[in-house]
């Protein structure tokens, strides 16, 4: 088969292969295509071949790999850059493009949306500068309001497992406290239920910036402008160091209940400036980022840091994922998303640096089921989807009209984000191969 193009003087013979199921497969035949074709041109060719076999086919964006590396330039430029011979028949693998196929209607808040969490497939959590946490069952549908903070919420975390009937959520706030809430996601369908915290966690001496839940257990960790990381129990029963408030209240759609206060079980000390972000991916390991330009890995049992990475910039966010959940991504006060691989001995330099943003990075998140994919959010108003196999973003989500303050994956195929435009945005239909 010969595919027409502007440059008829130079043709390359290729075979398109895929691991996708029908109807995405094309016949494994050699076709001749122009050497100056780009990714968009390759996508058009594959769509034309599929449409010739299936007239009802709807155009689908594709990405393309040669020897496991994504193509982000013309085919001829790619072959020259990689030293690949153009004389042989090239095998080009195609996958569904990692890009949103649908934008949901925005969910407006009363102030900046400073935190989002998509850990549960049943709902989305948001935290807002109005001091309220919110639970969204879908775009525009707020099922629960988590109330009680006197300052802006900076972070939200899902504490217990996704399949639990009653959900536990932790919120962190600029009022120096954390609050723990319990609610049933299925109980509120036609109205919004207000939920009061069952426990208030006090101990930080400055604004709390981040909260993360232990992957398996009943604890959360928090980070603060007071340069510390605190660990807390989330159980309802009181123990030494906890005091019970006898105050009870019954509000709108709210059951009467008591409220306890908790103190930190322990503190991790070592950072010298604001600890901007924490994640707790393993039972005994916590990672943190700080304005002191460092990323640290903490041993929960000893309370000491076992890894200390410096990048020369104040950091706002950190996450752990990728191959064997061993890669560390962080971003901060420059436009560069950095990725480290601490398994490589003798080096503390990032193994990847992605620099397509034009302002500070506010959030980064690894995809839970992919070794290659992660996202970043920035004050430039954009969210970028990345693949470690190319230096360019796979997709740029540009739906916010102000700074993006938070972002996360949801259900594996959506990105949820919040920003200074006071909106929760949902970008869905993202195909992760």
UniProtKB/Swiss-Prot annotation:
InterPro entries (alphabetical): G-protein_beta_WD-40_rep (IPR020472), NLE (IPR012972), WD40/YVTN_repeat-like_dom_sf (IPR015943), WD40_repeat_CS (IPR019775), WD40_repeat_dom_sf (IPR036322), WD40_rpt (IPR001680), WDR12/Ytm1 (IPR028599)
Transmembrane regions: none
WD repeats: 108-146, 148-191, 203-242, 270-308, 310-350, 356-396, 399-433
Chain residue ranges for the region called Ubiquitin-like (UBL) domain: 12-96
Modification N-acetylmethionine occurs at: 1
Record key words, sorted: Acetylation, Nucleus, Repeat, Ribosome biogenesis, rRNA processing, WD repeat
Keyword DNA repair attributed: no
Subcellular location: Nucleus, Nucleolus; Nucleus, Nucleoplasm
Chain spans, region Disordered: 238-263
UniProt GO cellular component terms: Cul4-RING E3 ubiquitin ligase complex; nucleolus; nucleoplasm; plasmodesma; preribosome, large subunit precursor
Similarity annotation: Belongs to the WD repeat WDR12/YTM1 family.
Subunit comment: Interacts with PES. Interacts with BOP1.
HAMAP family named among the record's database cross-references: WDR12
UniProt name for this protein: Ribosome biogenesis protein WDR12 homolog
Source species of the chain: Arabidopsis thaliana
Gene for this chain: WDR12
């Amino acid at each position: 088969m010969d595919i027409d193009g502007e440059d008829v003087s130079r043709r390359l013979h290729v075979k398109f292969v895929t691991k996708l199921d029908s109807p995405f497969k094309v016949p494994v035949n050699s076709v001749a295509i122009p050497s100056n074709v780009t990714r968009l041109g390759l996508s058009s060719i594959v769509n034309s071949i599929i449409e010739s076999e299936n007239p009802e086919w709807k155009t689908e964006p594709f990405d393309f790999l040669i020897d496991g590396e994504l193509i982000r330039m013309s085919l001829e430029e790619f072959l020259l850059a990689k030293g690949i011979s153009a004389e042989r028949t090239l095998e080009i693998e195609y996958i569904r493009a990692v890009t949103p196929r649908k934008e949901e209607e925005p969910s407006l808040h009363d102030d900046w949306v400073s935190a989002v969490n998509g850990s549960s497939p049943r709902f989305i959590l948001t935290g807002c500068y109005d001091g309220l946490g919110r639970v969204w069952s879908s775009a525009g549908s707020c099922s629960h309001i988590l109330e009680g903070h006197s300052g802006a919420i900076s972070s939200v975390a899902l504490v217990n497992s996704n399949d639990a009937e009653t959900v536990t959520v932790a919120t962190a706030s600029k009022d120096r406290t954390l609050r723990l809430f319990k609610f049933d996601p299925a109980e509120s369908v036609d109205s919004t239920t207000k939920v009061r915290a069952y426990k208030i966690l006090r101990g930080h001496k400055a604004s709390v910036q981040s909260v993360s839940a232990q992957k398996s257990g009943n604890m959360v960790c928090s980070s603060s402008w007071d340069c510390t990381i605190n660990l807390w129990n989330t159980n309802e029963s009181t123990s030494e160091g906890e005091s019970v408030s006898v105050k009870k209240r019954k509000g709108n759609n709210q059951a009467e209940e008591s409220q306890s206060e908790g103190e930190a079980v322990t503190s991790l000390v070592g950072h010298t400036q604001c600890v901007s972000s924490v994640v707790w991916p393993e039972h005994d390991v916590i990672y943190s980022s700080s304005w002191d330009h460092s990323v640290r890995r903490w041993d929960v049992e000893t309370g000491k840091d076992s890894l200390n990475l410096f990048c020369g910039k104040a950091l706002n966010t950190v996450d752990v994922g990728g191959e064997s959940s061993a890669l560390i991504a962080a971003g901060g006060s420059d436009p560069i998303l950095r990725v480290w691989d601490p398994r490589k001995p003798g080096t503390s330099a990032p193994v990847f640096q992605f620099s397509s943003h034009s302002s500070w990075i506010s959030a980064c998140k690894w995809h839970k089921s992919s070794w290659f994919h992660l996202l970043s959010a920035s004050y430039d108003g954009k969210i970028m989807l990345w693949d470690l196999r190319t230096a360019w973003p796979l997709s740029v989500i540009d739906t916010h009209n102000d700074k993006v303050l938070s972002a996360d994956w949801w259900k594996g195929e959506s990105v949820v984000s919040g920003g200074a435009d006071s909106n929760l945005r949902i970008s869905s239909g993202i195909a992760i191969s």
